Curated annotation (Swiss-Prot):
Binds together with bS18 to 16S ribosomal RNA. One of its GO terms (biological process) is translation. It comes from the Bacteria. This is Small ribosomal subunit protein bS6. Belongs to the bacterial ribosomal protein bS6 family. The gene is rpsF. Keywords: Ribonucleoprotein, Ribosomal protein, RNA-binding, rRNA-binding. It holds the Pfam family Ribosomal_S6. It comes from Actinobacillus pleuropneumoniae serotype 5b (strain L20). InterPro entries: Ribosomal_bS6, Ribosomal_bS6_CS, Ribosomal_bS6_sf, Ribosomal_S6_plastid/chlpt, Transl_elong_EF1B/ribsomal_bS6. One of its GO terms (molecular function) is structural constituent of ribosome. GO terms for cellular component: cytosolic small ribosomal subunit.
Amino acid sequence: MRHYEIVFMVHPDQSEQVPAMIERYTASVKEAGGQVHRLEDWGRRQLAYPINKLHKAHYVLMNVEAPQRVIDELETNFRYNDAVLRNLIVHTKAAVTEASPMVKAKESKVAEAVAEVESEEAGE
């Protein structure tokens, strides 16, 4: 089985359906004997340029190990799901399990905020 990195963007009005979509897509990978190595829900983010007059979208990143037929099935699901604005499926050489730069940046912001609050409390 090959390793793939999958990113898809969902219409912002359909954000509440994203967990169900993720569950459906991960279930199809696991049913075929594949494995999900990394799953990140980046949430609603600003688009670089408008798509269908939209300026925001809900982003999801998945790193999976799956047979080609499952990837073809996912691609078909993305194509015929009106809620999915864009998708990208890239073949990778190995499984990627470390956190993406998006998550690392978010974690560092949280750590900075916590440190700032602690320093303010210590200064009182």
